[in-house]
Amino acid sequence: GSLKARMCVRGKELLYEYCENYRVPCERIGKIIVATSPRQFETLRDYQRTAKANGAGELSWLSQGDVEKLEPAVFCRAGVLSPSTGIIDSHSFMLSLLGDLEAHNGVISYLTEVSAINTSSGITVRCDGFELAPRVLVNSTGLDAVALSPVTEPEDRGYFAKGHYYVLSGMSPFNRLVYPVAEEGGLGVHVTLDLAHQTRFGPDVVWTDGPDYTFETSNLDRFIDAIRRYYPDLDSTRLHTGYTGIRPKLGPADARTSDFVINGPEQTGVSGYVDLLGIESP
């Protein structure tokens, strides 16, 4: 019943519909979540129960042999299959959204920094050398959302979890997304594929004091160990640095996983003002 769960389920339906209507490339390739030891079986059962309760559909139980037939390169003791999980050409999707916006007389102001939001008398947005007074404002600034919000408490702060991705050169050994059982702070180092079926592994979780996109190659051995738990035949010479991304968190490393926070005018106390906080995943 969390916002993350509800938006994942409904968002998936809307996104597939949008891709079909606007011819945005996507592919339902499915996802397998794997347990590499019997100790993790109950976690997979929990995933099945949670998926059903959230309306995400059935996660099919897979034996070790079932997984070997679907993904010969993957080692596990059991798994669950989400057949409706897919991948999308995110660049084409963003261009399509831009076209939608401009078709409805919307304008994007590129290279314009928002430095402050004031709601003491209406809504005022301070930008580079000028101010705007919108009737409606949605603060969806991701990493800066908590700091920019004029209605959060002084003690509130955002936290930053950096994740690294490594790219696997050559032909992909996988046909689907492959996820290990989740770990603290994230979903674990998993397999992602793009529409060209290039393989990426990631992300890990590195807590930082602020936005820092430096790629730290000192984590390579940890990546290799994590990947080989479910892909034992990994040739580490095929791993190359990819990129980093940062997830905005609402709590520190030792905090329980937090939900998305969407505060509309009723919660913010400001007519026309909406805060989107801790939106760490699209």
Where are these regions (language model features)?
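C-terminal catalytic lobe of FAD-dependent flavoproteins
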Residues: 214-282
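Helix-loop-beta segment of a Rossmann-like dinucleotide-binding subdomain
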Residues: 25-35, 58, 66-99, 103-104, ...
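A short coil-to-beta-strand element that immediately follows conserved catalytic motifs
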Residues: 26-29, 155-161, 233-245
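Helical element adjacent to the flavin cofactor pocket in flavoenzyme catalytic cores
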Residues: 80-136
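Short loop/edge segments at beta-strand edges and connector loops
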Residues: 28, 63-64, 110-112, 127, ...
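Flavin-dependent oxidoreductases
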Residues: 116-216, 234
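A short, glycine/Asx- and small/polar-enriched loop/turn
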Residues: 39-43, 70-77, 118-124, 132, ...
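Dinucleotide-binding Rossmann-like beta1-alpha1 core, especially the glycine-rich loop
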Residues: 1-66, 188-189
